[in-house]
């Protein structure tokens, strides 16, 4: 999502590079979906600085979010959306439930 949607690198180039490098495709991806405003509020309350990705422009981060949405539509069995707006307990439960489903396949 970061390279293709965020940075605008053509998808074919990224796929070719991943194939050439023999990067394995993940069996499961847990996508923590949180609105940008909420994510930044949480970061500000827990850390003093942003990392390189978090320091990107708002439009870059919005494109990355759209990329994850697109990937989740393409790979619904592999990418599980976790509603990160919920309480910590509910998020943890969503993660455990997703892992249980995955491990029991």
Predicted regions and their residues:
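NTP-dependent small-molecule kinase module
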Residues: 37-105
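ATP-dependent NMP and nucleoside kinases share a basic, alpha-helical "lid"
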Residues: 1-49
């Amino acid at each position: 999502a970061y390279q293709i949607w965020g940075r605008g690198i053509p998808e074919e180039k990224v796929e070719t590079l991943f194939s050439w490098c023999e990067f394995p495709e993940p069996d499961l991806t847990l996508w923590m979906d949180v609105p940008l405003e909420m994510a930044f509020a949480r970061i500000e309350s827990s850390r003093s600085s942003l990392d390189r990705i978090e320091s990107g422009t708002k439009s870059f981060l919005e494109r990355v979010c759209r990329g994850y949405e697109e990937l989740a539509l393409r790979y619904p069995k592999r990418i599980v959306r976790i509603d990160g707006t919920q309480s910590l307990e509910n998020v943890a439960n969503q993660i455990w439930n997703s892992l249980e489903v995955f491990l029991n396949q």
